[in-house]
Design a protein with these regions (language model features):
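Binuclear metal-dependent phosphoesterase catalytic core
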Residues: 28-30, 99-105, 109, 117-148
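Active-site neighborhood of phospho(di)ester-bond hydrolases with catalytic His/Asp-centered motifs
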Residues: 1-6, 22-23, 74-78, 102, ...
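Active-site environment of divalent metal-dependent phosphoester hydrolases
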Residues: 3-13, 42-46, 81-85, 108-126, ...
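Conserved catalytic scaffold of divalent metal-dependent phosphoesterases
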Residues: 6-97
C-alpha cells in the first residue's frame, strides 16, 4: 500500500507495480481500516502538493466513508501533522487537518514519511494522546493487530 509523495509525478503515468495506491481512500484489509492521504504542503507547482484548505477538502470528501466505517485504525500520509514531527520551512510543514483527524478519531497508529531522519528534526516514534506516530521514512516494519 502507498500514498503519493511530493516527488511522485511519474506515478500518474506509470504507477509502481505490486502495490495498491490508497490515496484518498479508506481501504480495508482483514478488518483493518486504513485511511490514505498523500502529498505535502504546496511549495512549488506540481502534483501531490496541497494547501491547508485543499487538504481539508480532500478529507471532507471522505467524511461519509469514515463515518460509515466508524473511523479508521491507521492514518497513512506522506506528510506529518502540524506540530507533530513537522518542520518550520514550508515544504516540511504538516497539515492541520491531519491533527484534526487524530483529535476526532484517535486512531491507534499514524504513519507518515517525508521527514527524512537525517534532517535531524524528527524522531522515528512518538505519541500524541492515544495515537502512536511512526515516521516511516525509507522503510519501517510495524506489527499492527488485526481487529477481531
Amino acid at each position: 500500500l502507498y500514498v503519493h509523495g511530493n516527488h511522485d509525478e511519474c506515478y500518474a503515468d506509470t504507477p509502481p507495480e505490486g502495490c495498491i495506491c490508497i490515496d484518498d481512500c479508506l481501504y480495508e484489509y482483514q478488518g483493518l481500516r486504513i485511511l490514505g492521504l498523500g502529498g505535502s504542503m504546496r511549495y512549488r507547482p506540481g502534483d501531490f502538493q496541497y494547501t491547508q484548505k485543499e487538504m481539508t477538502w480532500r478529507i471532507r470528501k471522505l467524511w461519509f466513508k469514515i463515518r460509515r466505517k466508524k473511523g479508521f485504525d491507521l492514518l497513512v500520509t506522506h506528510s506529518p501533522a502540524k506540530g507533530l514531527g513537522d518542520g518550520e520551512d514550508l515544504p516540511h510543514q504538516g497539515f492541520d487537518a491531519f491533527r484534526d483527524l487524530l483529535d476526532k478519531y484517535a486512531p491507534p497508529f499514524f504513519i507518515h514519511g517525508h521527514m527524512h531522519l537525517n534532517y535531524g528534526r524528527s524522531k522515528r516514534i512518538s505519541q500524541y494522546q492515544q495515537t502512536i506516530i511512526v515516521n516511516a521514512f525509507e522503510k519501517y516494519v510495524i506489527e499492527c493487530p488485526v481487529p477481531e
